[in-house]
Each structure stands twice: as C-alpha cells, then as structure tokens.
Amino acid sequence: MSNRLPVLPQYLLPKKALTIFAGKVAGAKAGRVTTGLIRWFIGKYGVNMTEAANPDIRSYASFNEFFTRALRSGARPLADDPYICPVDGAISQCGTIQKDQIFQAKGHSYSTTALVGGDHELAAQFDNGSFATVYLSPRDYHRIHMPCDGRLMRMIYVPGALFSVNPTTARGVPNLFARNERVVCVFEGAAGPFVLVLVGATIVGSMQTTWHGVVNATRNGNIREWHYDKQYLGLKKGEEMGRFLLGSTVVMLFPHDTLSFNPSWTAERPVRLGESMAQTVAAITPPAMQADVS
C-alpha cells in the first residue's frame, strides 16, 4: 500500500480550525470536565504520572497545565557527556546533512534552507553537518531542554501547514518538517552554532519558549524574526528552553565535524531527556590522529 494513502484524509481536514478549537478546549478551566478529560487521556495513552512533580490530576486547572506538567526532581538525571537528548520521545531519524538535504523517511528528504525559513546563510553553516529528529508522542513529557550549553542568538517563526508529525505522516507527506509551522531557535555553543527547531502539528495549540512565551499566538501567515545577539541569553545543558501545548517534533542541527551520535541512536528508538546523545568529535579522535593534526 502506498505510504500516501493513510495520510490522504489530512489533506482534506480543516487542520487550522481543528487546531484552534483544540487549543481553546485545552486551555479551558472546566472543573470536573477538565479532570475527566485528563483521566481519559492518561488511560488512553498510558501516561506515567508517578514521574510528575504533581501527580494529583485534580489539581490541574486546565488540560494545558497537565500536558506541560513538570517532572519530579531526579526523574531525568543528566548524562556527563557533552550532548544530551533534550526531550522524551522516539528518534525519527538522525544522520548527516547532505547537499542541503535532511533525510525524513524512505523516499523523502527536505531542504535545510526551507526548514530554517529560507535563510541560505544560516543553512550553509550546517552543510555536511549532523541532524537528529525526535518525535514526541501524546504520552511523553512535553518540555524541551538544552542538549548542551548555548547562547541564544536568533529566533524565527515560520508559518506553515499543520499536518500530524507521527511516523505514518512522516512516511507519507513530502517535506513535512519544512512544511509545517515551526519555531527556529539559533544558538551559539562551544563548538559553533546549533539550531533547535520546534515543529508544530495538528491540534498543537501553541509553542512556547522560556524567554518569549507563546511564539505562534497570532498565526497571521508572516515570517517573524527576533535577534538576541546584543544581549546575553545563556542556557545551560539540561535547562528548559521551551514546551509544546500538545506534542510534536524537535529537529536539531549541528555543524560539520562537531559531534558523533552514539551508536545506539537509530531510527524508532525510544529516548529520554538527559540520556547521552553524542560525543564531541575531538573526544573520540584517536590520540595518534590528534598528534598528527597538531
């Protein structure tokens, strides 16, 4: 069966209207109705509330409060390695960026330039670099943290479609992650620039960052950009940088010769915030080779 057949209904659905409606429902403070919705969601998706800082579902005034719940202290210890996984989820793909193309799924790649909103100069910094795409399912923790230390330089809001971003849709919708609404966060790290892209989806009510709040509140169809290079906004490895109000996908971009993903990082593997994601290239270069370079 064609990979496109299962996703054909998504082309017909009024995705924006559904997303706006879902956002209103998720933000409503409806007492017992809200608690009932939360209880149903936990049962439907198998959410582990023992990991939550506040496991009492009756204390959440809205579904959004529940969905963006904090984890209890110690639930996600951070690995000592230079790069950690920034979210709970499952690896969609990871690998090398080749000729401005990022692998999406069998038969599909998309443009790095398109992903970052058409900025050729920004995209060029990641030629032959590394990428990782992590999908956050409904059951997952939906706050996004820093994979390494970084100084925020820019943020770009790119309007777009609102297709689902689950694995079935990734196999069936071309250019999915460069097609959907997204927020591009550009950082400067110890090894150079890196990017975290928060990709929206059907019924993702909003995307927030810790320094700005809700980024896509208006959805007026225009690319918007913020510059932070004149101020110092530094975030530490493991520090929260954003969150999804109803889940989605994070795409990470790193420059050439910056890092090497751990061998265990393969497509469809479940991952958790704080686990080791990658080593710096210098850290894994054999001593003899290091001597030759110097």
Swiss-Prot record:
Any one biological process term the GO annotation gives: phosphatidylethanolamine biosynthetic process
Cofactors, names only: pyruvate
Site keyed Cleavage (non-hydrolytic): positions: G247, S248
Major subcellular site: membrane
Cellular component aspect of the GO annotation: plasma membrane
InterPro entries xref list: PS_Dcarbxylase, PSD-B, PSD_type1_pro
EC number: 4.1.1.65
Pyruvic acid (Ser) PTM sites in chain numbering: S248
Record's cofactor remark: Binds 1 pyruvoyl group covalently per subunit.
Primary enzyme class: lyase
Cell compartment(s), UniProt: Cell membrane
MF term (GO), any: phosphatidylserine decarboxylase activity
Post-translational modification: Is synthesized initially as an inactive proenzyme. Formation of the active enzyme involves a self-maturation process in which the active site pyruvoyl group is generated from an internal serine residue via an autocatalytic post-translational modification. Two non-identical subunits are generated from the proenzyme in this reaction, and the pyruvate is formed at the N-terminus of the alpha chain, which is derived from the carboxyl end of the proenzyme.
Keyword Membrane: yes
Reactions catalysed according to its record: a 1,2-diacyl-sn-glycero-3-phospho-L-serine + H(+) = a 1,2-diacyl-sn-glycero-3-phosphoethanolamine + CO2
Keyword annotations: Cell membrane, Decarboxylase, Lipid biosynthesis, Lipid metabolism, Lyase, Membrane, Phospholipid biosynthesis, Phospholipid metabolism, Pyruvate, Zymogen
Pfam families: PS_Dcarbxylase
Biological or metabolic pathway of the protein: Phospholipid metabolism; phosphatidylethanolamine biosynthesis; phosphatidylethanolamine from CDP-diacylglycerol: step 2/2
UniProt similarity note: Belongs to the phosphatidylserine decarboxylase family. PSD-B subfamily. Prokaryotic type I sub-subfamily.
Known function: Catalyzes the formation of phosphatidylethanolamine (PtdEtn) from phosphatidylserine (PtdSer).
Subunit structure: Heterodimer of a large membrane-associated beta subunit and a small pyruvoyl-containing alpha subunit.
Name of the molecule in the record: Phosphatidylserine decarboxylase proenzyme
Native organism: Herminiimonas arsenicoxydans
